Amino acid sequence: MEKVDVYDELVNLKATELRLGLPGTEETVSCGKSNKRVLPEATEKEIESTGKTETASPPKAQIVGWPPVRSYRKNNVQTKKSESEGQGNYVKVSMDGAPYLRKIDLTMYKQYPELMKSLENMFKFSVGEYFEREGYKGSDFVPTYEDKDGDWMLVGDVPWEMFVSSCKRLRIMKGSEVKGLGCGGL
């Protein structure tokens, strides 16, 4: 046995051994059948001497995507928007044939007639009169809007509050292009 110890000292296998781990850390003895990791400080002898068979579990790693920050921020922003009355509901307004766009705040108006007067003054045109069955009569232009679903609808078809909450943009179209939007008289 002494020859083996002398050989180990001369060759110094431990110093030249290649292994994974940080330099200066001692190798831990682990059971070949267990899939659990052993803490580097605790060896089998220490575990047996203390009488404890379970080791303290490492702190739980945060699951990717948890907590759902994106949905939290989205909900938080929506509640802030509903709480603040000072913010306006700005939408773009375009008119067929006009080379420019405008942006208006829908919360400034109380009903459709106020909005129509403002649009007439802004773009210098006449809308005419709105009838529920026939749509807009007496004008070459018809105001339409895009709702939050992406559908184009006639301005005045829904109650004012619903219009203000669902309108994404306004477009004043030529009457010849509006035939499929729901008014039979055009």
Curated annotation (Swiss-Prot):
Biased composition regions of type Basic and acidic residues, renumbered to the chain: 38-51
One MF annotation (Gene Ontology) recorded for this entry: DNA binding
SUPFAM superfamilies xref list: CAD & PB1 domains
InterPro entries, sorted: AUX/IAA_dom, AUX_IAA, PB1-like
Alphabetized Gene3D superfamilies for the sequence: Phosphatidylinositol 3-kinase Catalytic Subunit, Chain A, domain 1 (3.10.20.90)
Tissues with expression: Preferentially expressed in stems, leaves and flowers.
Motif (EAR-like (transcriptional repression)): 18-22
Region Disordered, residue ranges: 25-62
Keyword Hydrolase applies: no
Keywords: Auxin signaling pathway, Nucleus, Repressor, Transcription, Transcription regulation
Main location: nucleus
Residue ranges annotated for the PB1 domain, each copy included: 88-175
GO biological process: auxin-activated signaling pathway; response to auxin
Pfam family of the protein (one): AUX_IAA
Subunit and interaction comment: Homodimers and heterodimers. Interacts with TPL.
Function: Aux/IAA proteins are short-lived transcriptional factors that function as repressors of early auxin response genes at low auxin concentrations. Repression is thought to result from the interaction with auxin response factors (ARFs), proteins that bind to the auxin-responsive promoter element (AuxRE). Formation of heterodimers with ARF proteins may alter their ability to modulate early auxin response genes expression.
Protein name stated in the entry: Auxin-responsive protein IAA4
Species: Arabidopsis thaliana (Mouse-ear cress)
